[in-house]
C-alpha cells in the first residue's frame, strides 16, 4: 500500500479552499448572458470552446493533491446539479465557493464548524420555502421558449425549437437531440404512435408518389397469431366492407392465401385494407399490441381471453382518425381510445419503469410511454464545424433539461434575482447560538453572489447593481443582456425553480462538508531520488576494441 500524507486543521482546509477557488473561478467566467468562453485543449484534434459550466468543471484536474480534493468536491456540486435539474451548474459552483470562502473566515476566527453548518442548513431550508412561494407555473409556449433560451446561453433559436417540440409531443413526449446535416437547426415530429413495421405487400400502397398506404378513419384489427387462412378473416371483413371504411390488420404475420385475398380485394376496390406485422418480439410484442388496442379503443383478439378471428365483430376493432403505412414504419394518428384508459396504461408503464433494473428495459418502456402520451420529436442541431456542433449540442441538452424542470416545478425570475428575493425568508431567522447565526449570515451573503458574478461578467459595478436590486421588489431586477433594470419575467429572463433550489441545496451540502473537514489524507508523492535506474554502465567503454571482430 502506498504511503499517505496526512494533513490536519487549517493547513488541510486552506489547500482545499485553494482548489475550490481555482475551479470556481474558471467555471464562473461562463455565468450570465455576457459570460465568457473557456477554451479546453484536447490531446488530439482541435480545442473545444464552451460556455457550459459543467463541461469546464469536468476538465479540471489539479496537480496538488489537496487542492484537487477541494476542486473535485465542487465538481461534484456541478455534476449532481446537472443530473437532477439539467442546468444551474455554474450557479451552484458560485454559491459553493461563496459559502466556503465566507465560512472559512469564521472557522479560522474560532467559530464552531458544526454549528456553522447547522446555521447554513437552517438558512437553506428557509430560502427553499421562500423560493416555492415566489415560483409560478410554467405553462405557455412563450415561457418554455424563454427558459430554453436562457439555459442555452441566450440562444433564442434553441429555446424556440424546444418549445415547438414540447407543444407538439406534449410534456410527456420524448424529445431527442441528434447531429444535423445542415447549418440550420431542424425539428422533426412524429405525431401519434409510430412503430417500426411497414406494409406486407407493396400492392397496399394507395399514394404512389409517397410510397405509402393512407387509411382515413379506418378500423384496426389486432391479432396475436399468424393469419394464413382467409376463412378465419371473412366474417369480420364482411362487416367492415358493409361499413364502407378501410381496415388495418396488425398480426404476428399475414401470409399465403389470406394476404393474396386482401391484396386482390384492395386492388379491385372492394375493401380498402392494409396488413402489417405486429411490432416487437415475445412478451414485448403482446404488450405493444395491448398499447395499440388501448390507443385505438379496440381489443387484441387472443385465445387467452376466449376470442377467435371468426367471432370478432366491429366492437372488437380499434379506430383512428388516420393511419399512414410506409415501407418500414406505421403511424397511427388520433386513436379513438378512452383518455382515462390511456392515462391508466401510462401510469402502469411508469411503475414498470421504476421497477426495471436494466437500462435497455427502461428505455423501451419510456418509448412506449412517449408513444401513448404524445409522440416523439427529434431536434437536429445544425452547425458549420464539428467543434461548434459539440458545443451547441451540449447547450441544447442543457436547455432541454431546464425546460422539463420548469414545466415540472415552475419558474422564478432569473438573473440571480430569485435568490435575492428568497433572502426575505431568512432575514428574520435566528439560530440557537451565535455560531448558528453566523452560518445564517454566510448563506445571506452567498445568495448575492450569482447576481454579483453575472454583473461582473457584463463589465458593470456589482455592488451598485446588487444594492439597486435589493431596493426593488418582486420580479424587478437587472437584465445583463440589455444593461437595463425592469420586470425580468416580462422580459423573458426566467429560471426553473427546480434549478435554483437544487443549486442552493447542493452548494450548501458540499460547502458544509468542506467547512467541517479537519483532516485530509492524500497519497504521498513518490521519492524520485531513490529511483536511480540502471547501474553505471561506465565499464562498457572497453568495447571500442570490438572493431576487429568484423
Curated annotation (Swiss-Prot):
Protein name, entry field: Chaperonin GroEL
Keyword Transcription regulation listed: no
UniProt function note: Together with its co-chaperonin GroES, plays an essential role in assisting protein folding. The GroEL-GroES system forms a nano-cage that allows encapsulation of the non-native substrate proteins and provides a physical environment optimized to promote and accelerate protein folding.
SUPFAM superfamilies for the chain: GroEL apical domain-like, GroEL equatorial domain-like, GroEL-intermediate domain like
Lineage of the organism: Bacteria, Pseudomonadati, Pseudomonadota, Betaproteobacteria, Burkholderiales
GO cellular component, one term: cytoplasm
Location in the cell: Cytoplasm
The reaction(s) this protein catalyses: ATP + H2O + a folded polypeptide = ADP + phosphate + an unfolded polypeptide
Keywords assigned: ATP-binding, Chaperone, Cytoplasm, Isomerase, Nucleotide-binding
Family, similarity comment: Belongs to the chaperonin (HSP60) family.
GO BP term, pick one: protein refolding
Annotated EC: 5.6.1.7
A matching Pfam family: Cpn60_TCP1
Name of encoding gene: groEL
Amino acid at each position: 500500500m502506498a504511503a499517505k500524507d496526512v494533513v490536519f486543521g487549517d493547513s488541510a482546509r486552506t489547500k482545499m479552499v485553494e482548489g475550490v477557488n481555482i475551479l470556481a473561478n474558471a467555471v464562473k467566467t461562463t455565468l450570465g448572458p455576457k459570460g465568457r468562453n473557456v477554451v479546453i485543449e484536447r490531446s488530439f484534434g482541435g480545442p473545444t470552446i464552451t460556455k457550459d459550466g459543467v463541461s469546464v468543471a469536468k476538465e479540471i484536474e489539479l496537480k496538488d493533491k489537496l487542492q484537487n480534493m477541494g476542486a473535485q468536491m465542487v465538481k461534484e456540486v456541478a455534476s449532481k446539479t446537472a443530473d437532477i435539474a439539467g442546468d444551474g451548474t455554474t450557479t451552484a459552483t458560485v454559491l459553493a465557493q461563496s459559502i466556503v470562502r465566507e465560512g472559512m473566515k469564521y472557522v479560522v476566527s474560532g467559530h464552531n464548524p458544526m454549528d456553522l453548518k447547522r446555521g447554513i442548513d437552517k438558512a437553506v431550508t428557509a430560502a427553499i420555502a421562500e423560493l416555492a412561494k415566489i415560483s409560478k407555473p410554467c405553462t405557455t409556449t412563450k415561457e418554455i421558449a424563454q427558459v430554453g433560451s436562457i439555459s442555452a446561453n441566450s440562444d433564442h433559436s434553441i429555446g424556440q425549437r424546444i418549445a415547438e417540440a414540447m407543444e407538439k409531443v406534449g410534456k410527456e413526449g420524448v424529445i431527442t437531440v441528434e447531429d444535423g446535416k445542415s447549418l440550420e437547426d431542424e425539428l422533426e415530429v412524429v405525431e401519434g404512435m409510430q412503430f417500426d413495421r411497414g406494409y406486407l405487400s407493396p400492392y397496399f400502397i394507395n399514394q404512389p408518389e409517397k410510397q405509402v398506404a393512407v387509411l382515413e378513419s379506418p378500423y384496426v384489427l389486432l391479432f396475436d397469431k399468424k393469419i394464413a387462412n382467409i376463412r378465419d378473416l371473412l366474417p369480420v371483413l364482411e362487416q367492415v366492407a358493409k361499413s364502407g371504411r378501410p381496415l388495418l390488420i396488425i398480426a404476428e404475420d399475414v401470409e399465403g392465401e389470406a394476404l393474396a385475398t386482401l391484396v386482390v380485394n384492395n386492388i379491385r376496390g372492394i375493401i380498402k385494407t392494409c396488413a402489417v406485422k405486429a411490432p416487437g418480439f415475445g412478451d414485448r410484442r403482446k404488450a405493444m399490441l395491448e398499447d395499440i388496442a388501448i390507443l385505438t379503443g379496440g381489443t387484441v383478439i387472443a385465445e387467452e381471453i376466449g376470442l377467435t378471428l371468426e367471432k370478432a365483430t366491429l366492437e372488437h376493432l380499434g379506430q383512428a382518425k388516420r393511419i399512414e403505412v410506409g415501407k418500414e414504419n406505421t403511424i397511427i394518428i388520433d386513436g379513438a381510445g378512452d383518455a382515462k384508459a390511456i392515462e391508466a396504461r401510462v401510469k402502469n408503464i411508469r411503475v414498470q419503469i421504476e421497477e426495471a433494473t436494466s437500462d435497455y428495459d427502461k428505455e423501451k418502456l419510456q418509448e412506449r410511454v412517449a408513444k401513448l402520451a404524445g409522440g416523439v420529436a427529434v431536434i437536429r442541431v445544425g452547425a458549420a464545424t464539428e467543434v461548434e456542433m459539440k458545443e451547441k449540442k451540449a447547450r441544447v441538452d442543457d436547455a432541454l433539461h431546464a425546460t422539463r424542470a420548469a414545466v415540472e416545478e415552475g419558474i422564478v425570475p432569473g438573473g440571480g434575482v430569485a435568490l435575492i428575493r428568497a433572502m426575505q425568508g431568512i432575514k428574520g431567522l435566528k439560530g440557537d447560538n451565535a455560531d448558528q447565526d453566523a452560518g445564517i449570515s454566510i448563506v445571506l451573503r452567498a445568495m448575492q453572489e450569482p447576481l454579483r458574478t453575472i454583473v461582473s461578467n457584463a463589465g458593470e459595478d456589482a455592488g451598485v447593481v446588487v444594492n439597486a436590486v435589493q431596493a426593488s421588489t418582486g420580479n424587478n431586477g437587472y437584465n445583463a443582456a440589455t444593461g437595463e433594470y425592469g420586470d425580468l419575467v416580462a422580459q423573458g429572463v426566467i429560471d426553473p425553480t427546480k434549478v435554483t433550489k437544487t443549486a442552493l441545496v447542493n452548494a450548501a451540502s458540499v460547502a458544509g462538508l468542506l467547512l467541517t473537514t479537519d483532516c485530509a489524507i492524500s497519497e504521498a508523492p513518490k521519492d524520485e531520488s531513490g529511483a536511480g535506474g540502471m547501474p553505471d554502465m561506465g565499464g562498457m567503454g572497453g568495447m571500442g576494441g570490438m572493431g576487429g571482430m568484423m
